[in-house]
């Protein structure tokens, strides 16, 4: 498996997109390590992908879903989470950040393999890098169609079975503030690479099904127009937008420093991005909902946005709520 550093990744993406060659890419959180391969050269034993209806998975190599499914997370103690939370929130109260995405790594006991999770998960975006990780993400990073770039930051989660769940989510002041901040950040990000940037849909609700029930999430759509020659510069465009604002915070550079210090683990490809270019259009995802294989054991990486209105108990519970597989 060939991996590229930042400079060579930009060159490779520009080269392939400029020639209209279909390819898939994975870029890690620190955007210093990338997998880039033409679609007709991808070995399915190495990489399986699904971007909407675009996939290299063939049902001839299907796996049998274990029954019953064993899924037993062991979250870090609340006291440990609280320490990282206070480190982040203190920076927010000092004015160093307005929004910070704090994440954790959680061991999970399961009878599911990476292939099992890829094959049987219900998600818009799925990635399985053999012996490394599987991702089943609901979140789009950017889409590009006919020169229009669109982003869909996703912020705000609630259990769908709660009374008035949708109303509670939309009326939650903390969620409102977090969503407004990330919308402003992404709008500014897109303005670095596009013009006529605008918010076309604000805080719309999607329903997701998990192995432990349904959840509601709010997203916003932001669009802009790219220059006519964007294909030749697709690599530069992508890397200028990294890391993704929805999984870092605002202001992005300082907040990234804050969360790296507080988290005390390597995100790796978690919260990086993955994308599929078909020769004309691009679809890409933020790699959240992420299970990693380390020394034969599974680890789930999850987190959430911290603002000045956040409290540690609620954020800890949200982090745990996201430790699921969408298999049902």
Regions found by a protein language model. Name each.
Residues 1-328:
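Extended alpha-helical targeting/anchoring segments
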């Amino acid at each position: 498996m060939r991996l590229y550093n930042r400079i060579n990744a930009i060159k490779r993406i520009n080269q392939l997109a400029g020639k209209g060659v279909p390819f898939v890419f994975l870029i890690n959180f620190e955007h210093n390590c990338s997998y880039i391969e033409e679609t007709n050269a991808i070995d399915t034993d190495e990489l399986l992908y699904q971007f909407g209806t675009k996939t290299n998975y063939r049902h001839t190599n299907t796996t049998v879903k274990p029954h019953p499914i064993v899924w037993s997370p062991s979250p870090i103690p609340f006291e440990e989470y609280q320490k990282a939370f206070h480190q982040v929130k203190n920076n927010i109260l000092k004015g160093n950040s307005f929004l910070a995405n704090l994440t954790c790594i959680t061991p999970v006991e399961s009878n599911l393999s990476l292939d099992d999770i890829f094959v049987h998960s219900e998600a818009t975006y799925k990635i399985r890098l053999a012996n490394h990780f599987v991702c089943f993400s609901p979140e789009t990073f950017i889409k590009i169609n006919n020169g229009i770039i669109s982003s869909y930051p996703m912020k705000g989660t609630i259990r769908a079975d709660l009374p008035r769940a949708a109303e509670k989510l939309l009326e939650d002041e903390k969620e409102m503030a977090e969503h407004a901040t990330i919308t402003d950040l992404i709008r500014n990000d897109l303005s670095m690479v596009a013009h006529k940037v605008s918010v076309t849909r604000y805080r719309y609700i999607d329903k997701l099904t998990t192995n432990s029930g349904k959840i509601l999430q709010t997203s916003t759509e932001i669009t802009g127009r790219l220059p006519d020659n964007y294909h030749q510069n697709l690599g530069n465009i992508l890397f200028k937008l990294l890391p993704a604002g929805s999984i870092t915070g605002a202001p992005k550079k300082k907040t990234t420093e804050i969360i790296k210090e507080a988290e005390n683990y390597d995100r790796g490809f978690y919260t990086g991005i993955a994308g599929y270019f078909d020769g004309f259009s691009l679809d890409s995802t933020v790699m959240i909902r992420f299970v990693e294989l380390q020394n034969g054991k599974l680890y789930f990486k999850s987190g959430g946005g911290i603002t000045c209105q956040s409290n540690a108990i609620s954020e800890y519970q949200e982090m745990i709520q996201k430790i699921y597989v969408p298999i049902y």
